[in-house]
Amino acid sequence: MPQVDPELFDRGQFQAELALKASPIAAFKKAIRQAREVLDTRFRSGREIRRLIEDRAWFIDNILQKAWDQFSWSEDADIALVAVGGYGRGELHPYSDIDLLILLDSADHEIFRDSIERFLTLLWDIGLEVGQSVRSVDECAEQARADLTVITNLMESRTIAGPEHLRQRMLQVTSTEHMWPSKDFFLAKRAEQKARHHKYNDTEYNLEPNVKGSPGGLRDIQTILWVARRQYGTLNLRALAGEGFLVESENALLASSQEFLWKVRYALHMLAGRAEDRLLLDHQRSIATLLGFEGEDAKQSIESFMQQYYRVVMSIAQLSDLIIQHFEEVILAPEDEAPPQPINARFQLHDGYIEAINDNVFKRTPFAMLEIFVLMAQHPEIKGVRADTIRLLREHRHLIDDDFRHDIRNTSLFIELFKCEIGIHRNLRRMNRYGILGRYLPEFGFIVGQMQHDLFHIYTVDAHTLNLIKHLRKMQYTPISEKFPLASKLMGKLPKPELIYLAGLYHDIGKGRHGDHSEIGAVDAEAFCVRHQLPQWDTRLIVWLVQNHLVMSTTAQRKDLSDPQVIHDFAQIVVDQTRLDYLYVLTVADIYATNPTLWNSWRASLLRQLYTETKRALRRGLENPVDREEQIRQTQSAALDILVRNGTDPDEVEQLWSQLGDDYFLRHTAGDVAWHSDAILQQPADGGPLVLIKEITQREFEGGTQIFIYAPDQHDFFAVTVAAMDQLNLNIHDARIITSSSQFTLDTYIVLDNDGESIGNNPQRVEQIRKGLTDALRNPDDYPTIIQRRVPRQLKHFAFAPEVTIHNDAQRPVTVLELSAPDRPGLLARIGKIFLEFDLSLQNAKIATLGERVEDVFFITDAHNQPLSDPQLCSRLQDAIVEQLSVSHEPTIEMTRLSI
């Protein structure tokens, strides 16, 4: 800390200002404001971050000393002002907690009560937000014994004012001789760290990470230092290196990583104007600019900054693992430790952990750098890797070069890992953690820490890839197998499960390079297969899966699965049942690993429907596609059978059906046709809109809520309906619009609530929806007032220009309008209003929300129920949608079309 820094705080000038003023508050506030401005200017000019946070602590020391001196403490008074916690370490960011302990010799606080209260009031009045406690030395001991947080804070302390002997006594009575011996402290801190990591999903790669608390954050470094302080009495990284826990290169890496996070945290506090440790989307762009990250556009600079952030926290996490493992071996070493048990000529088992026989194992036999992970997968009783062996891996990974990558011993070992029954994900994660995976597969190294600036992909590409493999493994076990019953069943029957793991490893490996990542990944996957001498059939399947890993999700979410031609086209891509099984399992795992909160029962239903229909098509033979007329006849026959059994007059049914047209029977099941028909025939002529609601959930975790509306057609029907559903907090995922020859509309919507779940067995909610829709359709003039709702915080940071493409369908007499736009409340209602203004009719819609982006497909016709044929009309329609959905007052970030 500086001894003198008059620019930051001039003691003489401050004392003079205090003497001139009747109240000291103004002088204190002025000094605090000026100091903040000075430090912020120094930060922007590139001043060393360690100096900045130490300078702020020094300044606060001076302010507190001056504030303390405003009160009459006798020179021999047994009371001291002590800095604890981060402030006790001498580290303060702009809005860090200023933790203070007012330390007394005696538990009798009364003699100092008035002065203490007035001192704390002064701190509050001058704008310092402090965390304070008032304790005697004995009370410190009592509370520290019971509370891990208290003992941790007291270990980091400095006397700011008053006698130092009080703090020394406090340290003595809270030492390891009296409480929290090293072993207990380590176990408690390790458990605390695990709980904290779990809170952040056990990953460094959250979309909005916490710079302090997330895995690999500043708290992990502090945990290392706390344990070291308790065990060795040292409290800095260099001292750790002196104890042999860090080599010099590791010490330098940890120190530089800490300083990078300090810069990020300082910038966060400065920009937020408050204590803020979450790297929110609100601040990522500004911090990227502030720290000098550049790119062709804002999105690229953010991604460059975040990739650097993720790689830094990965480095911290790696070293934290190593040091914590080192501590465990030293602090928890049993007194009667059993001798190591040999595993083979290169490795042995030491207290449950694998370690190299000697320091030259990886130098003499480099293939052992892959063998160690295969051994851990083959021997699940192995708890992990000894610290010295982790360090040896890190020190020898430079030996992984092209010769290593083509050595048949290494290629065989790598493939062997994917054939293990358990431990594949765990050991791939270790390989990534220790920097081995990215060295062995340079193309994988490229995606490490690579983020995608959107709400759909909540993990970096490498974390998502390893998550996918984890979910593939877990599909064979409960509870995840219950959520994905078909995928789990198929996973257990795949002839070579290792192939889907390899396809999963490569499915997104082409991201971040210019071009179609599926095509780029397929090229890399083929090169991998050739290098690893996989059979031709295996190679073809892996390459095909990587190349087509998006096809199933795209077809299910963007195309009309009731159209036999859609199923036939997809079946022609798949060709055989084996590919279909592999692709379905990969697709489910991919979507769920991308963002589990965006997986919902309707997506599950669509994928199962596409799988089932394609399976039937493959059994029937690609040369024998379903005939539309035959499908219509089968649906009508089955529906009529249901109705007649229930006592419905078949002549009335035939009369109703004659008004509906072929599309109605292609888009609905026989059960739905019977349900609709029975209700329509019972509806009074003047009964108003008919609104039917039912669950279509056939299996747990699949389905949605179906809303069927039958009413006289009106031009604003769709606009009114979707506006009302928006007001009812319903998310539309599918819409089928039929207009009968008698000018009645038969609309079917599949909806979920805001949690991505169907409405379920909730009569009150069902009645609320029924009444809301009925009232809206009876009073259509009210609908424009109900489409305004506040845009959620995160969505505001993904403003990009809407994309609209319009083309006529080659198979059906409709025009296809594809929309990609920022998700906003009331978006469908706005679209409906535009269709109304352009005198267009909606025939069908596929609605997909992918994070902050909607990917919707609308099948429309003109006022004469014909496809659009006027290019100028199409151009005006495009312009109207783009103008209506553009965010005019927010910066635009150009974004590419999302892929799962």
Swiss-Prot record:
Its EC number is 2.7.7.59, 3.1.4.-. Pfam families: ACT, GlnD_UR_UTase, HD, NTP_transf_2. Residues 1-342 are annotated as: Uridylyltransferase. One of its GO terms (molecular function) is phosphoric diester hydrolase activity. Its cofactor is Mg(2+). Residues 706-789, 816-895 form the ACT domain. Keywords: Hydrolase, Magnesium, Multifunctional enzyme, Nucleotidyltransferase, Repeat, Transferase. Residues 343-705 are annotated as: Uridylyl-removing. It catalyses: [protein-PII]-L-tyrosine + UTP = [protein-PII]-uridylyl-L-tyrosine + diphosphate; [protein-PII]-uridylyl-L-tyrosine + H2O = [protein-PII]-L-tyrosine + UMP + H(+). Uridylyltransferase (UTase) activity is inhibited by glutamine, while glutamine activates uridylyl-removing (UR) activity. InterPro entries: ACT-like_dom_sf, ACT_dom, HD/PDEase_dom, HD_domain, NT_sf, PII_UdlTrfase/GS_AdlTrfase, Polymerase_NTP_transf_dom, UTase/UR. Residues 461-583 form the HD domain. Modifies, by uridylylation and deuridylylation, the PII regulatory proteins (GlnB and homologs), in response to the nitrogen status of the cell that GlnD senses through the glutamine level. Under low glutamine levels, catalyzes the conversion of the PII proteins and UTP to PII-UMP and PPi, while under higher glutamine levels, GlnD hydrolyzes PII-UMP to PII and UMP (deuridylylation). Thus, controls uridylylation state and activity of the PII proteins, and plays an important role in the regulation of nitrogen assimilation and metabolism. Belongs to the GlnD family. PANTHER family: BIFUNCTIONAL URIDYLYLTRANSFERASE/URIDYLYL-REMOVING ENZYME (PTHR47320), BIFUNCTIONAL URIDYLYLTRANSFERASE_URIDYLYL-REMOVING ENZYME (PTHR47320:SF1). This is Bifunctional uridylyltransferase/uridylyl-removing enzyme. The gene is glnD.
